[in-house]
Curated annotation (Swiss-Prot):
The gene is Lrch2. May play a role in the organization of the cytoskeleton. PANTHER family: LEUCINE-RICH REPEAT AND CALPONIN HOMOLOGY DOMAIN-CONTAINING PROTEIN 2 ISOFORM X1, PTHR48051. Signal peptide: none annotated. This is Leucine-rich repeat and calponin homology domain-containing protein 2. Residues 1-46, 324-409, 438-478, 573-633 are annotated as: Disordered. LRR repeats lie at residues 97-118, 120-141, 143-164, 166-187, 188-209, 211-232, 234-256, 257-277, 279-300. It comes from the Eukaryota. Disulfide bonds: none annotated. The lineage of its organism: Eukaryota, Metazoa, Chordata, Craniata, Vertebrata. Residues 650-763 form the Calponin-homology (CH) domain. Keywords: Leucine-rich repeat, Repeat.
Length: 773
């Protein structure tokens, strides 16, 4: 109405318009309207009617009937300055009626005092003001659920906030907070927004917020996130944008996050455990110096990032040598179909100290031969088996003990019975030396510079013997093996004491035999002569009982004692008939034979049958790695014999590896790292060596790039196979050619050195002729 009247005159219209706008302000505006009207009358001259009209205030439109949005869906950027058209009194009055207090954008420095009852307020919006502290009137709002203090000048949060025990939403962003008090986390908060402050850390007490669903600490100066954030089991959204974070805690991988924003930080690696974030829908990671995953993968999006993390997790798991996707003996596994995107960022195998690959564990306990490769193992074992069968058919005198000792013989599958006799240490010494070497290998497995080639047959034995132990933790395994080694040391000492007592008793036995030989013939024919041999038989019983080690099974001991007693009885019957006719030399020899027969596990019938050809000095008995005669004969051998042989073998391998390093560095003019096995595993250096010997012998070489610093296993295998093919074409003989897994698994550096040496020894004329062809 005032606006229409204002249009009546030129100058008077301006006055009426001023009065109309002033009238909207309430009582103060009325004065403005009067003044405006007077101005209009003076200016218009004939328009006094316009100046005298009183402007009627127009009520506020229904747009502000809901001055405060429901719930925690506020977005400070969308707030409009339309609240300025309302009076404080009306806002406070509506807050008393509706429980929603909205004082946003009024530039208030203090909370306006009023006579309104605001104790039932459930939502309070005090954003965009100039409060330097949270108004004390707010602590009286006991049922308060939502508090918005966005864009003020608040520096601290007082302890009185604990009175708001129903507060679930708190927005105190864009203030001057430097710390968050511990008592803040005693509230049942579901949404906490503290962005754009000066926070340098988050208290560990944040783990108390079990119901927290959204946390925004962006645009602060936080350097480390506490591990207690892993206890926020209800957290859906986490915003840590624009801070000084270098590392993301692994505990976040266990949260049900839907949105994660850690952009504009200094994070270099996404933890592998983040692959467990199955509910994650949005991940924002731009403006970070990420190295893992590489940049080109991060640009492809969330799906590729999680693929990379899954592959990385598979590669970091402990791998057994037989579970690798590598070609094995006489059987090449088909290559897995990989897409280009997967192949580009398939990580390299992690041959760490825990993976069981490429480390010299010293697990060479039971093998007595050291074949060169897997082909030699299978061939040698077949020949040994056929020889044993033929020997068992020809030499029937040893068949009686074969079933009882079959279990003991399984660990000596690689021993040829027709080979010449060599010094075989005692059983206790063999096991002790092997376990000591195994323990030393376990303790030094973390030093990758001592990686040496392990003969494949020893790995084959270890897979059968230690498969249950490899599944346990390394610390428990080493502890158990130390206990076993200690028990074997004690057993070995007992065996030596028994052997010493046996030798003493044997000397006494010989002295007794000599005394009996000096007895006259008529006294030997007297009926008392068997009684004279009775103490000797008792002594022999004691000797035989002492010679059996305590580690033998009870059934074996009883069987052998029964057989030895039967042999002794028949022997004394036989000797009593020939005692007068036999000479001193024969008697001494028979005494020794009786002593040896008491030790050999054969029956009496077999003893009679074999007496014709094995009665002599027992030199024609078949060789067996576990025969007691061999152990008794070589009982005095040096217990460190096996250890010395192993150390000599390791020294030879180190020398060959050093020669391999010298050959590569001198030819290629490069400096290889200390871990030469890892340097050669991708096949790049070896392919360059082949091209150095003859250009273009390897047509294509897969090399790492800055974006993908490690080649995939498929590309490594391709390089290695190309190198071996080039060696064949250049003329390297098959017996000097290594296998692919010697390079890929870092287990055959000696074989690789032989191949490289053979490649370097090729005559230049032959290589040139091949290139001409």
């Amino acid at each position: 109405m005032a606006a229409s009247q204002g249009g009546g005159g030129n100058s008077g219209g301006g006055g009426c318009s001023g009065g109309g706008s002033g009238g909207g302000g309430g009582a103060a505006g009325g004065g403005g309207g009067g003044g405006g009207g007077g101005g209009g009358g003076a200016g218009a001259g004939g328009g006094g009617g316009c100046g005298g009209t009183v402007a009627v205030p127009i009520p506020v439109p229904t747009l502000f009937g809901q001055p405060f949005p429901n719930g925690p869906q506020w977005h400070p950027g969308s707030l409009q300055p339309q609240h300025t058209v309302r009076s404080l009194d009306r806002a406070l009055e509506e807050a008393g009626n509706s429980g929603i207090l909205s004082l946003s954008g009024r530039k208030l420095r203090e909370f306006p005092g009023s006579g309104y009852d605001l104790t039932d307020t459930t939502q309070a919006d005090l954003s965009r003001n100039r409060f330097t502290e949270i108004p004390s009137d707010v602590w009286l709002f006991a049922p308060l659920e939502t508090l918005n203090l966005y864009h003020n000048c608040i520096k601290t949060i007082p302890e009185a906030i604990k009175n708001l025990q129903m507060l679930t939403y708190l927005n105190i962003s864009r203030n001057l907070l430097s710390t968050l008090p511990k008592y803040l986390f005693d509230l049942p908060l579901k949404v906490l927004v503290v962005s754009n402050n000066k926070l340098v850390s988050i208290p560990e007490e944040i783990g108390k917020l079990k119901d927290l669903m959204e946390l925004d600490v962006s645009c602060n100066e936080i350097q480390v996130l506490p591990q207690q954030m892993g206890k926020l089991h209800s957290l859906k959204e986490l915003n840590i944008r624009r801070n000084n974070l270098h590392v993301l805690p692994d505990e976040l991988g266990d949260l049900p996050l839907v949105k994660l924003d850690f952009s504009c930080n200094k994070v270099t690696e996404i933890p592998v455990c983040y692959r467990k974030l199955h509910h994650l829908q949005v991940i924002i990671l731009d403006n970070n110096p990420l190295q893992v995953p590489p940049a080109q993968i991060c640009l492809k999006g969330k799906v590729h990032i999680f693929k990379y993390l899954n592959i990385q997790a598979c590669c970091r798991m402990d791998k057994k040598p037989d579970s690798l996707d590598l070609p094995s003996l006489n059987k090449r596994m088909p290559s897995q179909p990989l897409t280009d995107s997967m192949e580009d960022f398939y990580p390299n195998k992690n041959h760490g100290p825990d993976s069981g690959i490429g480390s010299d564990n010293g697990e060479k306990r039971l093998s007595t031969t050291e074949p060169s490769d897997d082909d030699t193992i299978s061939l040698h074992s077949q020949v040994s088996e056929s020889n044993r069968e033929q020997t068992s058919r020809n030499d029937s005198h040893i068949t009686g003990s074969k079933p009882d000792s079959q279990k003991d013989q399984e660990v000596y599958d690689f021993i040829d019975p027709n080979t010449e006799d060599v010094a075989v240490p005692e059983e206790g010494d063999t096991h002790i030396g092997s376990f000591v070497s195994f323990l030393k290998g376990k303790e030094k497995s973390s030093e990758k510079s001592q990686k040496n080639e392990e003969p494949p047959n020893e790995k084959k034995v270890d897979k059968e013997q230690l498969l249950p132990e490899e599944e346990d933790d390394d610390l428990k395994e080493v502890t158990d093996l130390r206990k076993i080694a200690a028990q074997l040391l004690k057993q070995e000492q007992k065996n030596r004491i028994l052997n010493h007592s046996t030798s003493v008793m044997r000397n006494k036995l010989k002295q007794t035999v000599e005394c009996e030989k000096s007895v006259p013939a008529d006294e030997g024919n007297s009926p008392l002569s068997p009684l004279a041999w009775q103490p000797l038989e008792n002594q022999k019983d004691q000797i035989v009982d002492q010679q059996w080690p305590e580690s033998q099974p009870i059934i074996w001991q009883n069987e052998e004692r029964r057989r030895s007693k039967q042999i002794r009885k028949e022997y004394f019957k036989y000797k009593s008939t020939r005692k007068n006719s036999s000479g001193n030399e024969n008697e001494e020899q028979e005494s020794d034979n009786a002593h040896m027969s008491a030790q050999s596990p054969v029956s009496s019938e077999e003893y009679d049958r074999s007496d014709g050809f094995s009665h002599g000095p027992f030199g024609l008995k078949p060789r067996s790695a576990f025969s007691r005669a061999s152990r008794q004969e070589y009982g005095a051998a040096d217990p460190g014999f096996t250890m010395r042989r192993k150390m000599e073998h390791l020294r030879e391998e180190r020398e060959q590896i050093r020669q391999l390093r010298n050959n590569l560095e001198s030819r290629l003019k490069v400096i290889l790292p200390d871990d030469i096995g890892a340097a050669l595993m991708d096949g790049v250096v070896l392919c360059h060596l082949a091209n150095h010997i003859r250009p273009r012998s390897v047509a294509s070489i897969h090399v790492p790039s800055p974006a993908v610093p490690k080649l995939s296993m498929a590309k490594c295998r391709r390089n290695v196979e190309n190198f071996l093919d080039a060696c064949k074409k250049l003329g390297v003989s098959q017996e000097r050619l290594c296998l692919p897994h010697h390079i890929l698994e870092e287990r055959g550096l000696v074989k690789v050195g032989v191949t490289v040496q053979a490649l370097l020894e090729l005559p230049t004329t032959k290589a040139s002729q091949l290139s001409m062809a």
